[in-house]
From Swiss-Prot:
Record's keyword terms, sorted: Ribonucleoprotein, Ribosomal protein
HAMAP family assigned to the protein according to its UniProt record, in alphabetical order: Ribosomal_uL13
Protein name as annotated: Large ribosomal subunit protein uL13
Family: Belongs to the universal ribosomal protein uL13 family.
Keyword Ribosomal protein listed: yes
Role: This protein is one of the early assembly proteins of the 50S ribosomal subunit, although it is not seen to bind rRNA by itself. It is important during the early stages of 50S assembly.
Pfam families xref list: Ribosomal_L13
Natural source organism: Latilactobacillus sakei subsp. sakei (strain 23K) (Lactobacillus sakei subsp. sakei)
Gene Ontology molecular function: mRNA binding; structural constituent of ribosome
InterPro entries: Ribosomal_uL13, Ribosomal_uL13_bac-type, Ribosomal_uL13_CS, Ribosomal_uL13_sf
GO biological process: negative regulation of translation; translation
PROSITE patterns cross-referenced by the UniProt entry: RIBOSOMAL_L13
Length: 147
């Protein structure tokens, strides 16, 4: 009888990938990034073990919002004070803090538990074309072939 392979945390080999977000739709980029962070692109994927890789996303300021999402998509948060509901559009967030837009999108696609939190910590987003992870020798991942 064959048994299913279950990865152990010490056996996982992690790679580093760089993804250029220029002119890629936010949702399509986020689904690919979330899948790689979870490790679903590997044959050794195990749901209860963090088998994912590290992702560096550059040029977050050049992400594409399709349709009228830049003006119509709203993000809400509350300050926990009376009348403290704050609302910002996706376009405002892209102008002021483009890294946050990708982080919020990817975080919503990860599990809502400690495993998802640890997977989210392996995401590194930069607004410009430069990043500080050259020492890890990241591979350039062209996701236009995937999406």
């Amino acid at each position: 009888m064959r048994t299913t392979y279950m990865a152990k945390p010490g056996e996982v080999e992690r790679k580093w990938y760089v993804i250029d977000a220029t002119d890629i739709a936010l949702g399509r980029l986020s689904t690919v990034v979330a899948s790689i962070l979870r490790g679903k692109n590997k044959p050794t994927f195990t749901p209860n073990v963090d088998t994912g890789d590290n992702i560096i996303v550059i040029n977050a300021e050049k992400i594409k919002l399709t349709g009228r999402k830049a003006t119509d998509k709203l993000y809400h948060h509350h300050s926990n004070h009376p009348g403290g509901l704050k609302t910002r559009t996706a376009g405002e967030i892209r102008e002021n803090n483009p890294e946050r837009l990708i982080e919020m999108s990817v975080k919503g696609m990860l599990p809502k538990n400690s495993l998802g939190h640890n997977q989210f910590l392996k995401l590194h987003v930069y607004a410009g074309g430069e990043h500080k992870h050259q020492a890890q020798n990241p591979e350039v991942l062209d996701i236009t072939d995937i999406i």
